[in-house]
Structures are given as structure tokens and as C-alpha cells.
Regions:
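N-terminal secretory signal peptides that target proteins for export/translocation
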Residues: 1-12
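Intrinsic structural disorder/low-complexity segments
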Residues: 6, 20-21, 393
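Hydrophobic alpha-helical segments, especially transmembrane helices
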Residues: 12-14, 495
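Periplasmic c-type cytochrome electron-transfer domains
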Residues: 2, 29-504
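Bacterial N-terminal signal peptides
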Residues: 15-30
């Protein structure tokens, strides 16, 4: 964020925003550019639609959402057989894996290099991860990872990228992801270090909000230097709720919202990410991950087992995880592949249970649905055109064997498309068709329960935002006008908009 020469908070240049029936407020302009023409926003209330209080349709949980287990309930209508399968998947999701060989052969195979011993350690109570609180060694950052890649170095690299067989070219020594933990007898790869710089920003009414800008580095590299062109991208583990419903949205309904060339000239140009499906051996629509780099829950789960824990699955059968040719001791370490599990560490049956569990983590119902302040916030959300990317609703298609997820009107507030979010949030690291400034629109359902479930309120792909307000103020690029509109609102209206988002 730019600062004034005297180091006072930057005060955005604000033209008049005319809102019928309201006191005139100011609209934040482009950082230091000229003021746009006055904008009129209708104050017409946005009515609540039938069923909107149940964002997951009939699959929305009916269980209590007043405890840390609010994200850990199974989808309503799952049936007795489904409930039993869900509970087995839950046990595997929370299991602490150990290195091989071990007397507990059903739980060994961890690593050799890894970031976490369980799925639950990353997805805190099935919710959102967080950046390390105080850096290593005070915090090992189990729920935040550092992705690594390099630009294509030769024709083979360029071919693989062009044909979508890979999303990135891995760093040659350290692979796709920095692993900060190793099994006994091996060195870990190093540790992520974060430095934050506080940058004050003055809003239209004079309120000053401090945003923290992170800088990432790696300390204690154990296997030699990084490639000189290495690109780093931090990733916090996202919430798990509703992913089966997102997977059930018909592909055509997502594609129809894409507008890569902004043909309608509304300033919003969402794009799909086209990625390789190892399961189907073809290019497919990306849906999951911060840049929509995975096409399905199965492939997202397999990638996490391999990269985060070093465990082999039917889709990623390599037991060495993210080890590279530059790490022979890692490649030659004992593994937990067993005949019982089809020569894998996470056999097909175990893997299917984890996938089913993930697909059926239920969305919680709306809170404070009829609160006047929440409804006022909804009006402002639409007035600022936040819904242009955070698409309120879809109807799911047919899900084979899971009728409770089928034909449901859901309210995830995402379009699952890639959008340019500006230089401030850019990681400058392409992933598939996503460039360094693009991110997939994050679903908003359950956002207001983050503190209860995960014990914090840190948002965005790297957890830099310490509140919903900070997350909004980091928006730029295609979301700049919405961010500027938010910055121009009165304190009461900003609070109302946040109450609406917290109610989803």
C-alpha cells in the first residue's frame, strides 16, 4: 500500500457516491489516480429467497453449530450406511500417521519428508488453517505450506504445461512443496519464515485500518540452494465444508459465468482453470485449491496425502511423496506400502472413505438470518456488486449414489472461477492457466464461524488478513471497485456488510 511522504496513513482520493435515500458517502478512487464519475447505487432491498437460510440445501446440517465441531457434522439425509462410512472416514482424517516400519502397519508410511501427521492438523476442526504465529521453532506451520516452482526450462517443460499434464514445473531439488519435517534419520528441507510490515490505510470516514504485508523466505535449507528462478507461494489449508456440493455443480453452469475477455464490459472477467485429471487421464475443469488447480475432491485428497504427509494412494502411488532425485536418502527410505492395501499406504478402501467424508462435511445453516442489520448488509453487498464474483447460488446436478447432494439449491457465494485480484495479493507464480495475480473466488459459507471452529480469524490464501474487513481491503484488480465502495461506506454500513458475510 502506498504511504504519504510524512509516513501518515494513506488517505484515498474520494469522489462523491450518491445513494438514493441515504446520506451521501464517498467512494474510494484508484490508489493515486483521478476520481471516477459519481456513481449511483440503488437502495432497493434484496429480498431473502426461500431456502436461503439453508446454504447446503436439504443437506445442510441440523446438528448444533454452537461448538468447535460446527464444521464436523455429516450431510443431512446421508442415511445410516452413509453415516457409518462418514464416521470411518472421520477416523482416518484424524489419524496420526507414523513412519515405516512400525508395529501399527495400518498407520505407517508417513513421509519421509512431510508437513503434517494428519489431515485434521491442517484443516483445524475441518476448518481453516492459519499461518505460523511466531515462526519456527515456536510454530512449525502445520496448516500452512510453501509451494515451489520454476519457469519452464526447456521444450519438454513447455510441452507438459501446454498440454496441461502439469500445472507447474517443480523446483528441481525441493520439489513442489517445502517439507519442514522429516522422519528420524533424515533432514527436513528447511523452514518458512514470514516477516510482516504494517501498512495503515485511511478509509473514507477517517477510520484507519492497518494491513499487514507478508514477505516469505526459507531458512535452513538442508539440500543445497534453491534454483535461482524459484517462485514461492504460501497456502493456508481451506475449510472442508460443502466441497461435495461444489463438486456437484454442473460444469456448464460454471463455464457459462466465465467471461475471460470481459465481453460485457462490467470489469469482471472470470476464467476457468483447465487442469489434468489423473483419474480420468484428460484435461478437466479445475474447482479446488486456491487457484482451482484440482478437478475433484478425490484428486485434491490424493495430492494432500502425497505432498503434505508423503502417503501413497490409488491416484498418487509413489510412497516417497515429494522427494526428488536430489534427495536419494529420502527416495530409499522404508515405506508403508502393504499387500493388504494393494501395494499402497492408503489403500483404495481407506481412500474412498476419506473422500466420502470430505464430500459430506455439512454446511451449517445461516445465522441471524432475519436481523435487520444483516439484511442491510446484504443490500450493500449487492450494491457494491460483490456478487459478481461471489455468485450466491447454484443448483447441483445428480450425484451418483448420493441423492442427498443431488438437485440441491445451494448458496456458496463463489463462482469457482479465477479472477485478477491485483498486485497486492499476487504471488507471481502461475498454476495451470492461472497467472500470478489470479485466484479462485473463495466460498463464503460458514465464514462467520471461523473463530469458533478454528480458533482464529485469519483469511485469504496466506492468512495475512486478521479480519473480514482486512480481507476486503486487500481486494484489488477486478474487485477494486467493490473494495473502494466498501472503504467509502459509513462505519455502520461497513459493520452491516460484515454482519451479512458473517451470517452466511
Amino acid at each position: 500500500m502506498p504511504q504519504s511522504p510524512n509516513n501518515r496513513p494513506l488517505r484515498l482520493r474520494l469522489p462523491l457516491l450518491l445513494v438514493p435515500g441515504l446520506t451521501a458517502v464517498c467512494l474510494a478512487a484508484a490508489a493515486l489516480g483521478g476520481a471516477p464519475a459519481p456513481v449511483r447505487i440503488s437502495e432497493a432491498a434484496i429480498p431473502n429467497e426461500p431456502g436461503e437460510e439453508s446454504p447446503g440445501g436439504s443437506a445442510t446440517t441440523r446438528d448444533s453449530i454452537d461448538t468447535r465441531e460446527a464444521f464436523s457434522h455429516f450431510s443431512h439425509g446421508i442415511g445410516l450406511e452413509g453415516e457409518a462410512k462418514f464416521k470411518v472416514g472421520n477416523a482416518i482424517f484424524r489419524k496420526l500417521w507414523v513412519s515405516a516400519p512400525s508395529s501399527t502397519t495400518s498407520s505407517d508410511g508417513l513421509g519421509p519428508l512431510y508437513n503434517s501427521r494428519s489431515c485434521q492438523s491442517c484443516h483445524l476442526k475441518d476448518g481453516r488453517g492459519r499461518p505460523p504465529a511466531a515462526n519456527f521453532p515456536a510454530d512449525t506451520a502445520e496448516s500452512m505450506f510453501l509451494r515451489l516452482s520454476i519457469p519452464p526450462q526447456n521444450d519438454e517443460h513447455r510441452r507438459l504445461l501446454a498440454e496441461r499434464h502439469v500445472n507447474t514445473i517443480n523446483e528441481p531439488t525441493y520439489g513442489e512443496q517445502l517439507q519442514n519435517i522429516a522422519i528420524q534419520g533424515l533432514d527436513n528441507e528447511g523452514h518458512m519464515h514470514i516477516d510482516y510490515k504494517e501498512e495503515p490505510l485511511a478509509l473514507g470516514d477517517g477510520t484507519v485500518v492497518s494491513l499487514r504485508r507478508p514477505t516469505y523466505s526459507i531458512e535452513g535449507l538442508k539440500y543445497g540452494p534453491l534454483h535461482p528462478d524459484t517462485m514461492l507461494s504460501p497456502r493456508v489449508a481451506p475449510p472442508m465444508i460443502g466441497v461435495g456440493l461444489l463438486e456437484a455443480i454442473p460444469e456448464a453452469d460454471i463455464r457459462t459465468r466465465a467471461d475471460a475477455g470481459d465481453k460485457d464490459k462490467d470489469g469482471i472477467s472470470g476464467r476457468t482453470n483447465e487442469v489434468w485429471s489423473a483419474e480420468h487421464n484428460k484435461v478437466a475443469l479445475g474447482r479446488f485449491g486456491w487457484k482451482a488447480g484440482k478437478p475433484s475432491v478425490r484428486e485434491q485428497a490424493a495430492g494432500a496425502f502425497a505432498g503434505d504427509m508423503g502417503l501413497s494412494t490409488p491416484l498418487v502411488p509413489n510412497p516417497s511423496g515429494d522427494c526428488t532425485a536430489a534427495q536419494p536418502a529420502c527416495l530409499n527410505a522404508p515405506n508403508g506400502n502393504t499387500e493388504r492395501d494393494g501395494g499402497l499406504e492408503v489403500g483404495a478402501k481407506l481412500f474412498d472413505h476419506v473422500v466420502f467424508y470430505s464430500q459430506n462435511l455439512a454446511v451449517p445453516p445461516r445465522r441471524n438470518f432475519n436481523d435487520p442489520a444483516v439484511n442491510r448488509g446484504k443490500t450493500l453487498f449487492y450494491a457494491l456488486r460483490c456478487q459478481s464474483c461471489h455468485t450466491p447460488s447454484f443448483t447441483t446436478g445428480k450425484v451418483e449414489g448420493q441423492p442427498h447432494l443431488s438437485k440441491q439449491k445451494i448458496w456458496p457465494y463463489t463462482d469457482l472461477l479465477l479472477h485478477d485480484m491485483g498486485e497486492g495479493l499476487a504471488d507471481n507464480r502461475p498454476e495451470g492457466m492461472a497467472d500470478g495475480r489470479e485466484w479462485r473466488t473463495a466460498p463464503l459459507w460458514g465464514l462467520g464461524l471461523t473463530r469458533l471452529v478454528s480458533g482464529h480469524t485469519q483469511f485469504l490464501h496466506d492468512g495475512r488478513a486478521r479480519s473480514i474487513e482486512e480481507a476486503i481491503l486487500w481486494h484489488a484488480g477486478e474487485a477494486k471497485s467493490a473494495r473502494d465502495g466498501y472503504a467509502a461506506l459509513s462505519k455502520a454500513d461497513r459493520e452491516a456488510l460484515i454482519k451479512f458475510v458473517e451470517s452466511l
